[in-house]
Every structure is written in structure tokens, then in C-alpha cells.
């Protein structure tokens, strides 16, 4: 009964971390473009 909960938590952490990395990279990319312009 614990495995579904654990797998759900792991999937949630992976999704959130991936989303966070994507947002950070996007913000850094935009900031770099603003500096160039």
C-alpha cells in the first residue's frame, strides 16, 4: 500500500524539479538576451 504513494511522491518531485530547472533556464536565457540588447 506504500509503493503507490512513494511512486507518486517520486514522480511529483521529478516533475517539480524538471519544471524548476526549465523555468530557471528560461529566465536566465531571457536575462542574457536583455543584456545583449
Swiss-Prot record:
UniProt keyword Lyase, yes or no: no
State the annotated membrane topology for this chain.
Single-pass membrane protein
Q: One MF term in GO for this entry?
A: electron transporter, transferring electrons within cytochrome b6/f complex of photosystem II activity
- Where would you say this protein principally sits, based on its record? plastid
Choose any GO biological process term that the UniProt entry carries and state it.
photosynthesis
Q: Where in the cell is it found?
A: Plastid, Chloroplast thylakoid membrane
User: Its GO CC terms?
Assistant: chloroplast thylakoid membrane; cytochrome b6f complex
Q: Transmembrane ranges?
A: 5-25
Q: Which UniProt keywords apply?
A: Chloroplast, Electron transport, Membrane, Photosynthesis, Plastid, Thylakoid, Transmembrane, Transmembrane helix, Transport
Q: Which family does it belong to?
A: Belongs to the PetG family.
Q: What does this protein do?
A: Component of the cytochrome b6-f complex, which mediates electron transfer between photosystem II (PSII) and photosystem I (PSI), cyclic electron flow around PSI, and state transitions. PetG is required for either the stability or assembly of the cytochrome b6-f complex.
* The protein's assembly and partners: The 4 large subunits of the cytochrome b6-f complex are cytochrome b6, subunit IV (17 kDa polypeptide, PetD), cytochrome f and the Rieske protein, while the 4 small subunits are PetG, PetL, PetM and PetN. The complex functions as a dimer.
Which NCBIfam families does this UniProt record tie to the protein? PRK00665.1 (NF001907)
**Name of the molecule in the record:** Cytochrome b6-f complex subunit 5
Q: Which organism is it from?
A: Phaeodactylum tricornutum (strain CCAP 1055/1)
Amino acid at each position: 500500500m506504500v509503493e503507490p504513494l512513494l511512486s507518486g511522491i517520486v514522480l511529483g518531485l521529478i516533475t517539480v524539479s524538471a519544471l524548476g530547472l526549465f523555468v530557471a533556464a528560461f529566465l536566465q536565457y531571457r536575462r542574457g538576451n536583455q543584456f545583449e540588447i
